[in-house]
């Protein structure tokens, strides 16, 4: 086994996880993610299916991208509450955006930063896709993993 040291630009910790942004990589905090998240030993992992802008009947609630982001975030909060986890427990998120544009990315970051007041950003990937399999007109889906 090889050992190595990471010279950290910034390391944030909460009770469950360590969020690391190594020196030599760009600072991702303006984009709402961390390069590395370490889950401390003995923590439970929660795997959340993709959440999107649906109502309780599984119907898409809006065609506007910003409104879909807001409803998706609301649904994520509902799912997290059911599992008794918070945004600070999220260690990885994958965001699928249909018909991706830089404008959509900026809207996502703006809405999410208002909704999530945290300094412990999860590791994150945005995946542009031609369409989503959730509902016709759905433009965003977010799946995530939490550790607590």
Give residue ranges: language-model regions.
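N-terminal presequence-like segments and the immediate start of the first folded domain
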Residues: 2-74, 78-91, 100-148
